[in-house]
Design a protein with these regions (language model features):
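Short acidic-hydrophobic catalytic motif
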Residues: 1-209, 223-285
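Short acidic catalytic loops
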Residues: 209-220
Length: 285
């Protein structure tokens, strides 16, 4: 019996948020699988023509991700521990820049969609969401797979054994039909409470140093370094909260790729939403 997932309904109805597509939980073979229902699509407001000229911030690409310089010792130590653990991380030095919808940056060709900026203006997404903090970030560069009925796996995933262990120990939900090593069908709440702290322990860093990428970090690094992050018809979770108990997600190639920003429940487990860890190393005072 085939499992039903939210993605199929999203593609039938057109783009809408992940959370509002789900009306209940499908009980299938003892598993808690979110399933789509006939939800009303969210209308995203049509852009209005500004009455006055908009000030455009102009940056070079090197003002967002600083050119490679000498890597701090703390960053090098984390990279070495990650390598010993079989985890690949890429270091990027982000600058202290606040972007907006009208910012002009060479290579920033697929900006977050209009809805993202509108929700920041409405206060549903934090005001600091489009800010790149002055810090080194070490990000997992793995490519998401395309959707295959929830059974898809990241190729040669170094986190697979850890995720299988956590499911076996019942620290994260083990759902029937979902591969034990899968990065999918894990809720943001489980990621924050269990998975990311376990990764921090593997890397020998404080739990607070490991988080999900913000939507703007995913977008900027994706544009500049990893366009393939927007070329799979799956999503990934972001660090940003939305409203009271939701979390941003995005990256779906069917809905704009790198520009795509959606949201889902923080407690939701979705067959097409994965994650990537990011380690933050802030400058020493």
């Amino acid at each position: 019996m085939a499992m039903q997932y939210i993605e199929s309904e999203l593609r039938r109805q057109g783009k809408e948020n992940l959370a509002d597509t789900i009306a209940s939980v499908h009980k299938l073979n003892g598993s808690d699988i979110p399933f789509p229902s006939a939800a009303t699509s969210i209308e995203k407001p049509v852009a209005q023509t500004p009455e006055t000229p908009v000030a455009i911030k102009r940056f070079s690409r090197d003002q967002l991700i600083l050119p490679e310089t000498q890597i701090p010792q703390e960053v090098s130590d984390i990279l070495q521990r990650a390598e010993r653990a079989g985890i690949r991380l890429e270091p990027y030095h982000l600058s202290n820049v606040v972007l907006d919808e009208n910012s002009s940056v060479e290579g920033w060709n697929s900006k977050p969609e209009r809805w993202y900026w509108e929700q920041i203006g409405k206060g549903n997404i934090g005001q600091d969401a489009p800010k790149l903090s002055d810090s080194w970030v070490l990000v997992d560069p793995i490519t998401r797979p395309d959707y295959k009925d929830g059974e898809q796996l990241h190729i040669s995933d170094p986190l697979g054994p850890l995720l299988a262990k956590l499911r076996k120990e019942k620290k994260i939900k083990n759902l029937k039909g979902i591969p034990a090593a899968s990065r999918f069908v894990i809720s943001p709440n489980e990621l924050i409470a269990v998975v990311l702290p376990e990764i921090a322990e593997l890397l020998g860093v404080e739990a607070s140093a490991v988080r999900l990428p913000k939507a703007i970090e995913f977008n900027v690094i994706g544009n500049m370094k990893h366009p393939e992050w927007g070329q799979a018809n799956t999503w990934e979770w972001f660090e940003d909260n939305f409203e009271d108990d939701n979390r941003l997600a995005g990256g779906d190639s069917d809905n704009g790729g790198l520009a795509d920003v959606d949201y889902g429940w923080s407690c939701g487990r979705y067959g097409g939403v994965a994650f990537r860890p990011l380690v933050v190393v802030s400058p020493k005072a």
